[in-house]
Curated annotation (Swiss-Prot):
UniProt function note: May be involved in plant defense.
Protein family according to the UniProt entry: Belongs to the plant thionin (TC 1.C.44) family.
Name recorded for this polypeptide: Thionin-like protein 2
Signal peptide, first to last residue: 1-20
Alphabetized UniProt keyword annotations: Disulfide bond, Plant defense, Secreted, Signal
Post-translational modification: Is disulfide-linked.
GO biological process assignments: defense response
């Protein structure tokens, strides 16, 4: 029984580490759009550019004892900026990954300067 518990803990730890690896926005966004469109019907798939922008932004790590609010405010600054400035550059028919990615990067720069 103890061995089974240890195996489950090790596998869970490996899965958590795999999930924590960050995929660059430029790679995540087009794949997310394809998956979102395939899993949605009109008019729901019209939200895919926003959904994928939110999903592909680098989210902060889970809170720890040493974390502070700056990490979260930086993420929400990027999300707000990307939603306002970048989502409209993309559609299901024309993902415009290069422009959206550059726009999201500029949001990262703007938000980093503010914090």
């Amino acid at each position: 029984m103890l061995v089974a518990v240890m195996i489950v803990m090790v596998i869970g730890n490996l899965l958590a580490q795999t999930a924590a690896q960050k995929i660059p926005f430029k790679e995540c966004y087009p794949a997310c759009l394809v998956e979102c469109k395939a899993g949605s019907k009109f008019p729901k798939y019209l939200k895919c550019p926003f959904t994928c922008t939110k999903e592909c932004l680098q989210q902060p790590s889970p809170p720890s004892v040493s974390s502070n609010n700056i990490d979260e405010s930086d993420y929400f600054c990027k999300l707000g900026c990307a939603t306002y400035h970048c989502v409209s550059l993309s559609s299901i028919q024309n993902p415009n990954v290069e422009r959206v990615s550059a726009c999201v990067d500029s949001c990262s720069n703007k938000c980093t300067k503010k914090n």
